[in-house]
Amino acid sequence: RQYFIKCEEELHKVAPVRSAALRRELKARITVASYFKPMCAALEAYRAELGKNTFQHHYTTEANMLARIVLGGMTAKQWAQANGITGEPRDHMSTLQLEHLSYLEQSNITLIELGQGYHQRKAELIRLSQRWLARRMEE
């Protein structure tokens, strides 16, 4: 009986922590999803200003650039294959990876709207990523 009482006490200690972690993970997943469409819209508007059409591979290139920064040089597809993941890779990313990706997507929107080209944005996003990760390490 004491064993079950101790288990119940431990559960009451752990449950709020786990619940908070799950809420943070869900928030990160929703946030990263909410920035993707505006990023694509910003890219399309930027390319239209340049008189260029935007095709599917342009969106893929942007997504792959950000994924490579977050996932250690791999695209989301490569990362999923390397980790034996089926389905949507973002559904299997850690909360930290999702928060990192959403930060970069949000930053990329701003850089696109400022008229920066792909290579300039990529360099700036790598720099911003390093700063973001350094701040996270300090927490």
Where are each of the predicted segments found?
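Positively charged, phosphate-engaging catalytic surfaces used for nucleic-acid and nucleotide handling
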Residues: 1-139
